[in-house]
Design a protein with these regions (language model features):
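Short acidic, flexible loop segments centered on an aromatic residue
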Residues: 46-64
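N-terminal signal peptide c-region/cleavage motif recognized by signal peptidases
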Residues: 13-15
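Buried hydrophobic-core signal for structured, non-transmembrane domains
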Residues: 39-44, 86, 99-103
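Exposed beta-strand and adjacent loop surfaces of beta-rich binding modules
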Residues: 38, 50-54, 96
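Beta-sheet-dominated interaction scaffolds and their linkers
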Residues: 17-42
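Terminal connector regions
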Residues: 90-124
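Intrinsically disordered, low-complexity Pro/Gly/Ser/Thr-rich segments with frequent PxxP/GP/PP motifs
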Residues: 64-93
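Positively charged n-region of N-terminal signal peptides that target proteins for export
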Residues: 1-4
Length: 124
């Protein structure tokens, strides 16, 4: 029995890498523009095979909410941290529940991962 468990552990010993997103519970703050609120998230890329991440803001039913960032697809190099400012209209604040980052795969002929990761933070 022990040898079977050891064999399974050896065969299925894969390292899974993901990216990180903080804060876990972001809050909206005054942006300096009337009727616009702002929040900031930080992305940390711990995946050597991924270089781009897409940002999205969603309501409780996972429907997209309009928002503005400098870029919707953000380049983040391996082991690099990037801060992203997200702006939204005050009229959409009540609807917005989640801000998510989604890893984007590059289309190339090289061998690549098929694992896409999405990390979401919930607004307080």
């Amino acid at each position: 029995m022990r040898s079977a468990v050891a064999l399974c552990l050896l065969l299925f010993n894969y390292a899974v890498h993901s990216h990180e997103q903080t804060p876990t519970y972001p809050t909206w703050k005054v942006s300096g523009i009337s009727e616009i609120k702002k929040t900031q998230i930080r992305l940390w890329n711990s995946r050597p095979d991924i270089e781009y991440y897409e940002i999205g803001v969603f309501d409780g039913d996972w429907q997209p909410i309009p928002f503005v960032t400098a870029y919707k697809i953000i380049p983040v190099k391996y082991l690099q941290e990037v801060k992203v400012d997200i702006y939204i209209r005050e009229s959409n604040i009540e609807e917005a529940r989640y801000v998510c980052s989604l890893s984007k795969l590059r289309s190339s002929n090289e061998s690549q991962t098929l694992l896409v990761t999405r990390i979401c933070s919930k607004f307080k």
